[in-house]
């Protein structure tokens, strides 16, 4: 895709991201009331991280830095999964304590008794958004050195030639 085509398509996506950012700011404003409890602190941290990731994503999209876009997308999806974990947890406060204390939630269970491992959380969120698993798996290729790194360096040229771009 040529830069002009890319920029035209990108403008619509950036507009959507900016709308999502506004919604996130509005959510955070609604969370913060006269009193703050642990839930409020957790959800404010989740929303703030979401906003900051959107703010980082937009310039990376404009620069066509797909490696960073993929990594930021994956982090955003992890943020979503951890936030969702608080809603399905057997003990929401335990999830919130783990996240605020910086400890993994993988030993905690959801209301059905399942350990909240990343794979399980991914599958649970995919029940809400059917493409979540596919996007998560593809974005993971940017986090780990994989075929994504190879295909980003290869550029097709004329006469059945390929070029390597770094």
What is the predicted function of each stretch?
Residues 16-18, 76, 152, 165:
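Residue-identity detector for glutamine
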Residues 46-52:
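Helix-boundary capping/turn motifs
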Residues 29-41, 55-58, 62-66, 71-137, ...:
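Short non-catalytic regulatory patches outside canonical folded cores
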Residues 1-4, 117-123, 164-165:
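Charged, low-complexity surface segments at secondary-structure and domain boundaries
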């Amino acid at each position: 895709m040529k830069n002009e085509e890319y920029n035209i398509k990108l403008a619509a996506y950036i507009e959507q991201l900016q709308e999502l950012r506004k919604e996130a700011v509005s959510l955070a404003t609604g969370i913060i009331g006269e009193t703050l409890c642990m839930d409020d602190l957790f959800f404010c941290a989740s929303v703030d991280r979401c906003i900051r990731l959107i703010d980082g994503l937009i310039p990376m999209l404009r620069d066509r830095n797909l490696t960073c876009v993929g990594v930021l997308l994956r982090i955003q999806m992890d943020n979503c999964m951890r936030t969702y974990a608080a809603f399905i947890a057997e003990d929401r406060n335990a999830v919130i304590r783990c996240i605020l204390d910086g400890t993994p939630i993988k030993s905690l269970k959801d209301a059905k008794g399942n350990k909240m491992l990343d794979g399980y959380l991914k599958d649970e969120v995919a029940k809400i958004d059917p493409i979540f698993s596919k996007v998560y798996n593809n974005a993971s290729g940017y986090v780990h050195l994989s075929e994504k790194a190879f295909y980003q360096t290869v550029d097709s040229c004329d006469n059945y030639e390929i070029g390597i771009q770094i």
